[in-house]
């Protein structure tokens, strides 16, 4: 059940480290090399280098000795290169010993310390659960979310098997509807590169504005998206946080799937600390999803004057869905709709003329004089003309 809910993230892969005879031999040979290098370089090399070699020797020993205090795993980066990794099985205890037992006042601040409505998950994670004097405070946001943001859930969407053609087609169709409703200006945050590629192939020839993909956080693509007057950006991985698209650049944020974390050796070890799988999901997995969702939501409004629609397409997030309450708890109070027409009206009520003139089928910016001379009957341009007539 855990894997079915959460096998989404593909930014980096973590696999359990299995000690084979060949790996044991290789590790011991590497350890001997590091030890010999410390002896050979002890007179000539700087002390920090000798210390570094000693640390690497000790780290390798964890793997061939199979130290039970550590979770040992292989982490593959975006290019598929593996790294040997070890993390403590009890990080909260280490933090208590290294930090909180020193009785030095500490102030922890972040925009995503809360998971849903509670600080409890982060308090447990950083080892503050047994500390008596822990005070929490949540500052109100200066953003007027109820006025400047609209949350959309699709209505009547059938539950489709994960990664099936039916699900991919549903997502593609909904994205096209929303891009049309918001006249472009869209960021789509995927939880898996495989899903992003599949949807991209379905919609790439149907987009009314330029469509771009960010593979492994390509800064060139992000810069190109910012230069465009109007475009749609498909992104995943690290783009859920740390990228900034202020103003009308992103006026529609689409999240096809809830960002549940993928199972890995660290989470499997955490799972053994809970009596039941359900307790583990509610105490660890759901809070992680809520934090990641809030980080993704943060791409929508970057200044106090920004306006944006946010669409979550996952059927589990919709009213009546399995995680609807958890999703709403993770986000600020927002008006909610299940009608794409409301999304269109929200955008038309809040955007100026320049926003709409950058939307036409050939993806060129169109001013009033050019539009009058074009005589086009393109559906997208007819919608633009109707907008101005209503104004």
Feature locations, PLM:
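Alpha-helical interaction segments
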Residues: 183, 377-378
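ASCE RecA-like P-loop NTPase motor cores
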Residues: 1-361, 365-371, 385-390
């Amino acid at each position: 059940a855990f894997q079915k809910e959460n096998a989404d993230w593909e930014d980096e892969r973590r696999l359990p480290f299995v000690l084979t005879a060949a790996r044991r031999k290789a590790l011991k040979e590497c350890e001997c090399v590091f030890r010999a290098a410390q002896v050979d370089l002890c007179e000539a090399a700087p002390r920090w280098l000798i210390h570094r070699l000693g640390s690497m020797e000790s780290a390798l020993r964890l793997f061939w000795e199979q130290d039970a205090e550590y979770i040992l795993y292989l982490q593959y980066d975006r290019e598929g290169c593996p790294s040997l990794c070890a993390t403590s099985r009890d990080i909260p205890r280490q933090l208590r010993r290294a930090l909180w037992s020193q009785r030095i006042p500490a102030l922890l601040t972040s925009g995503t310390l809360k998971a849903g409505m509670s600080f409890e998950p982060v308090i447990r994670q950083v080892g503050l659960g047994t500390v008596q004097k822990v005070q929490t405070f949540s500052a109100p946001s200066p953003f007027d979310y109820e006025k400047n943001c609209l949350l959309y859930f699709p209505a009547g969407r059938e539950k489709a098997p994960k990664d099936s053609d039916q699900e991919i087609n549903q997502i593609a169709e909904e994205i096209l509807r929303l891009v049309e409703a918001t006249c472009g200006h869209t960021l789509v945050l995927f939880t898996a590169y495989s899903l992003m590629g599949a949807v991209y192939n379905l919609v790439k020839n149907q987009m009314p504005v330029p469509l771009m993909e960010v593979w492994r956080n390509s800064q060139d693509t992000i810069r190109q998206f910012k230069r465009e007057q109007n475009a749609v950006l498909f992104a995943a991985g690290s783009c859920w946080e740390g990228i900034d698209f202020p103003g009308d650049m992103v006026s529609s944020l689409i999240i096809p799937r809830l960002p549940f974390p993928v199972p890995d050796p660290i989470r499997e070890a955490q799972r053994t600390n809970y009596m039941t799988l359900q307790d583990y999901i509610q105490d660890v997995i759901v809070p992680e999803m809520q934090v990641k969702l809030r980080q993704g939501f943060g791409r929508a409004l970057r200044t106090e004057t920004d306006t944006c629609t946010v669409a979550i397409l996952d059927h589990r997030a919709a009213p009546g869905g399995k995680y609807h309450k958890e999703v709403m708890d993770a986000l600020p109070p927002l008006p909610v709709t299940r009608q794409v027409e409301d999304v269109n009206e929200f955008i038309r009520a809040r955007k100026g003329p320049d926003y709409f003139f950058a939307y036409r089928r050939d993806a060129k910016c169109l001013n009033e004089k050019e539009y009058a001379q074009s005589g086009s009957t393109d559906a997208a341009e007819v919608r633009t003309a109707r907008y101005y007539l209503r104004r």
